Amino acid sequence: MKLLLSFALLGLVACQEKCDSQNKYCFPNEVATWTGAVEYCLKNGWKLAVVNSEAKQMKIEGLAKNLPEFKNGKVELWIGASDQTKEGHFVWIANGQPIEYANWLPGKPDNKDGKEHCVHLWYEKAKKLNWGWNDVVCTSKRRFVCERKKK
């Protein structure tokens, strides 16, 4: 039991070490499916990020520039939006609210092959993709951004 608790605490500490204490964003050093990312954030007292304003988008972009992947020219991060319940109707998983602010890449969302229902932020220098949103297959694995829940 002590060992299990120690691992749980290590996971929480690792998440917090990557967080901005003022705005409370976290970039766990993990890769997961979209559902796995939702579960990871919830398990640690967070939520998969709700990017419902340009200010939040800019804050997350600024923080993500500190990730090692950014220096390599490519970052993909799950955020908490999906249209799994109703095709074409993207909502925030944390509160069920429809997306009002969005930063879709040109031509997105496109639900390629009828299988893309989860949203990620995508930065890729070589392709000139500058933090736009893209719909992708939910079972693909990538890093993610959690946001501390309001108390």
Swiss-Prot record:
Its cofactor is Ca(2+). GO terms for cellular component: extracellular region. CDD domains: CLECT. The keyword GTP-binding does not apply. Residues 1-15 form the signal peptide. SMART domains: CLECT. Transmembrane segments: none annotated. This is Salivary C-type lectin 2. Induction: Blood feeding does not affect expression levels. One of its GO terms (molecular function) is carbohydrate binding. Residues 25-147 form the C-type lectin domain. Keywords: Disulfide bond, Lectin, Secreted, Signal. It is found in: Secreted. Disulfide bonds join C41-C146, C118-C138. Salivary protein with carbohydrate-binding activity. Binds to D-mannose, D-galactose, D-glucose and maltose. Agglutinates host erythrocytes. Probably participates in mosquito innate immune responses to prevent microorganism multiplication in sugar and blood meals. (Microbial infection) Binds to the surface of and agglutinates Escherichia coli in vitro. It comes from Aedes albopictus (Asian tiger mosquito).
